[in-house]
Amino acid sequence: MNSPTVYPVPSQISAHAHIDEQTYQRMYQASIDNPERFWGEQGKRIDWITPYSQTQVKKTSFDANNLSIQWFADGTLNASSNCLDRHLERNGDKIAILWEGDDAKEQRQLSYRELHTQVCQFANVLKAQGVVKGDIVTLYMPMVPEAAVAMLACARIGAVHSVIFGGFSPDSIASRVIDGKSKVIITADEGIRAGRTIPLKHNVDEALARPSVTCVNNVIVLKRTGANVDWQQGRDLDWDELMAGVSSDCPAEEMNAEDPLFLLYTSGSTGNPKGVLHTTGGYLVYAAMTHEYVFDYKENEVYWCTADVGWITGHSYMVYGPFANGATVLMHEGVPNYPTPARLGEIVDRHKVNILYTAPTLIRALMAEGKEHFNGFSGESLRIMGSVGEPINPEAWRWYHEVIGHEHCPIVDTWWQTETGGILISPLPGAIATKPGSATRPFFGVKPAIVDSTGQILEGAVEGNLVMLDSWPGQMRTVYGDHARFALTYFSTFKGMYFTGDGARRDEDGYYWITGRVDDVINVSGHRLGTAEVESALVAHEQVAEAAVVGYPHDIKGQGIYAYVTLVHDAEPSEALRQELRQWVRKEIGALATPDLIQWATGLPKTRSGKIMRRFLRKIAANEVTNLGDSSTLADPSVIDTLIASRLNQR
């Protein structure tokens, strides 16, 4: 493929940025040379009840037999008071949450003082239900301000929140509740998303009807739509009734830096849910610091992260990072392309959004609809734009840059994981020139390496497995209740290294390009080929909206290349177009990457967060369609039936 264009740092950004290129180089070197001193200084960005000692800043070992990750270990603090109380004196009247409903006519605002009051009240509600420090509280909520209230209320009293994305099934709820032995669930009657209601309370009822769920005493229900829902007297409690007249005085619990803050279950494709455990001190320092520097956040800016609170992005970059920094956060209940693709631009203009953080899935969906939907979009307020969730293909990057950013907003293409707590590799807007499709360089204190299959570190411009050689404060501490699984999953593949599970290549400028999950590598005739590269080539064709590529058993090559292709709305599928796309990929990458089979797909199997579930695609491509496994986490399970019916590899 043609070498990507480099987009220099805009001078109007670098002139006023927190971090310019020289500062980045100096700080990064200091963070690697002496992490204890570096993080000892950075830890001061949040408030501590008992300050940590310099000798306790970093106590970490990546040895799978002696695995331990501790940061600021003797310090004490409270995450809720860092997100709320410390802003009250100077910024109590500042807007903390700007909320827009699925229907744009519904708007709410909460100042930091109002948010603080509600959090303290709800913390007292939880205490009255017998919730104490260390208890796990499950949240299954719509995207409303009360979701943030409930999270911060848990943190205030030292309870550990476990947020389940509002699209997950009763089975998913049950397995997570059982694993965390949760006594209390917080939910709503219904959620609203893209004009449809989501039966949250009904799903909770179904989950709790399973004989295996015996730990839950109470379900607190917020009225979102006012729908009639089944009510179990004694167990089910009304949010508004509980909040009426309750005291707003609730001192924050003193927590050790290594006390758990939250659990977040990753929806692994197989096996039991994996409870990723994050603790209080290191996580909060890292979330606040990455939010400030990666987005070059300035006081009084409006910041919009389109992620749902049920994902790590919602935790780190809609709640904890922004609120620790005293930001004004836009929260949107629905999806930013409903009722029309113009919605994203309308929200940006209506609320004068300065920083936008969204996912490639949404960008590609908007791209497929056509840029004419943004003809009336001003975008004057936008300064920084971000991308999260998966590698963004260069074509979508350029579209985002031109149509949404009007070619003047730097794009921070951020790479990180639920397990990392915060962003690990990303441009800093005032410091690092960007290349479409590259996450560029590591954040401070982050020590990436590329290794071969034996764990040998590769230098220079190479491709291989992405690992981290040292810890950072936001790193997960364990898999809840299963430390052996933590060691096995992340530290046993490559000795003394954290294995991300992703492949990457590093170019001659030292920039990192994420090539996708290592299990998304196809071995064609002995040559390794990243699926992301083939997908990017396909999507670069003007008639392709989205593509997913997997390997399938091939009699001659070992693995062949099977592409699922969604066309833009006015394109017609044909055999001629199929051949054109094969030649297109051949020209873009080389003969080796030519897809063997191209299946037209009206939709792809995605989770509700927009991640493509490739295990289904791999099985369909391999003609293994009798036992596909659980599809309850898919946004639209019917997509699977359509793909099976039109599969190309039937024997």
UniProtKB/Swiss-Prot annotation:
Residues holding ATP: G389, E390, P391, D413, T414, W415, W416, Q417, T418, D502, R517, R528
EC numbers, comma separated: 6.2.1.1
Post-translational modifications: Acetylated. Deacetylation by the SIR2-homolog deacetylase activates the enzyme.
CDD domains per the UniProt record, alphabetical: ACS
Binding site for Mg(2+): V539, H541, V544
PROSITE patterns given in the database record: AMP_BINDING
Keyword Phosphoprotein attached: no
Catalytic activity entry: acetate + ATP + CoA = acetyl-CoA + AMP + diphosphate
UniProt entry keywords in alphabetical sequence: Acetylation, ATP-binding, Ligase, Magnesium, Metal-binding, Nucleotide-binding
A Gene Ontology biological process term: acetyl-CoA biosynthetic process from acetate
Cofactor(s) demanded: Mg(2+)
Sites of N6-acetyllysine modification: K611
Any one Pfam family match given in the protein's UniProt record, by short name: AMP-binding
One GO location term (cellular component): cytosol
Major enzyme class: ligase
Gene Ontology MF annotations: acetate-CoA ligase activity; AMP binding; ATP binding; metal ion binding
Residue positions binding CoA: R193, A194, G195, R196, T313, N337, S525, R586
Family: Belongs to the ATP-dependent AMP-binding enzyme family.
Role summary: Catalyzes the conversion of acetate into acetyl-CoA (AcCoA), an essential intermediate at the junction of anabolic and catabolic pathways. AcsA undergoes a two-step reaction. In the first half reaction, AcsA combines acetate with ATP to form acetyl-adenylate (AcAMP) intermediate. In the second half reaction, it can then transfer the acetyl group from AcAMP to the sulfhydryl group of CoA, forming the product AcCoA.
PANTHER family: ACETYL-COENZYME A SYNTHETASE
Protein name: Acetyl-coenzyme A synthetase
Organism whose genome encodes this protein: Shewanella denitrificans (strain OS217 / ATCC BAA-1090 / DSM 15013)
